[in-house]
Amino acid sequence: MKLSIDWLALFLGSWITSVQSMCPTILEPAYPAPSLAAGWSAQLIAQGLSRPRTILFDTNGGLLILQQGVGIAHIKWTDDGSTCLQNPVQTIVVGSTVVLTNDDSTTRSLLTTKLTPNQLLISRGTTLNIDPEAELPSTGHCQLKSFNLSTLTPESPPYNFTTSGHLLATGLRNSVGLAEEPLFGGIYSVENGPGNMTRNNIDIHLYNPGEELNFHGYLNGSSENQGANYGFPYCFAVWNELDVGGGLRVGDQFSMVQNKSSNDTWCNNVEVHVAPKLTFAAHSAPLDMIFLANGTEAFISFHGSLETTPPVGYRISSITFNPTTGLPTSPSTSTISTSDIISNSNSSFCPGNCFRPVGMALDGLGRLFVSSDATGEIWVVVRMGSVG
């Protein structure tokens, strides 16, 4: 046995040395390197950024990076294939942070759609744990809307989020990640639930409510789910069934109290509220979502939280989709709908000294680029054998 172990160690050491020799510039993180699922490889390709979050490729293959206190930067690498991207050259594209200043966390996310052109989706959240104003559509709180850009002219006044646009959803506390399913154009969001949750005055916050994957229909004329209420600020997704009780299952919606105006029956009335397509662990904090072009898989970045011990999230996970329906393959009651791609082997270093993913972007070769805001980094993650 010792001989075989020694041989394996020698083989792996030689293989790693070979890979590094093919890519002479290897950046190393200042913390334990993330763990990878079988069949995947990853490499740190940029350091020293200022809390990078949203990332997006331009038409020339450069990566646009939104950085806190900096603005928008553009980075281009020497591309030697697979995870070997070297010599990053950074240019500040937008250096004024004034144009990006936001006094709170209301308007959080933007998405331009492809299958229905000229539509800009905007998700507006809340700074509050529980926001009573979200109950009233007229406030504009906790909503997802689409805006038609084709009707704008240089003389047009700017859209007013509260009074303009096409309402896709209400009752979304903080749906930061938005994605368009590439084959049918279905609109999805990932929802961050509140903390400090109680039910009938009993603390259940460690494992409830769950984070959510919500479906908002299509922009091509179908009205399925559009304008629907997804529950917040009164109804929340079950993650831990035992803590919630009441015979509810994962993905059902529960009320914090049981009275005539707010109760579990009302929360689960499909004529009133739309339940999530999938539910994820409480406090895992999903912040971005992106689909493969063939519609078979989507990736979600879980930013993570310290609400539980050990901390949860701090990972990129995948969800399988049915390309003939544009819907997840897992049932809404599943607790195992995600498969981790890259995560931290020891989350005790989190949040300040570990991989903490936020934004994601896929390049033309199918490589997944990820920002880690806590560490000021960009990583590239590759399914082995999928690119040269």
Language-model-derived ranges and their functions:
Residues G48-G61, V94-Q119, L167-P182, V274-E297, ...:
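Beta-rich, blade/repeat-based domains predominating
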Residues V70-G71, P194, T375-G376:
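Loop/turn residues immediately N-terminal
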Residues G62-L66, T101, Q119-S123, G186-V190, ...:
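Conserved beta-propeller blade signature
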Residues I202, P209, G359-G388:
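Blade-level signature of beta-propeller repeat domains, shared across WD40, Kelch, NHL, RCC1
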Residues M22-S35, T126-A134, S138-T163, R173-N174, ...:
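Beta-propeller domain segments
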Residues H74-L100:
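Blade-loop segments of beta-propeller domains
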Residues P32-D58:
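Mature N-terminal segment immediately following signal peptide/propeptide cleavage
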Residues M1-Q20:
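Fungal secretory targeting signals
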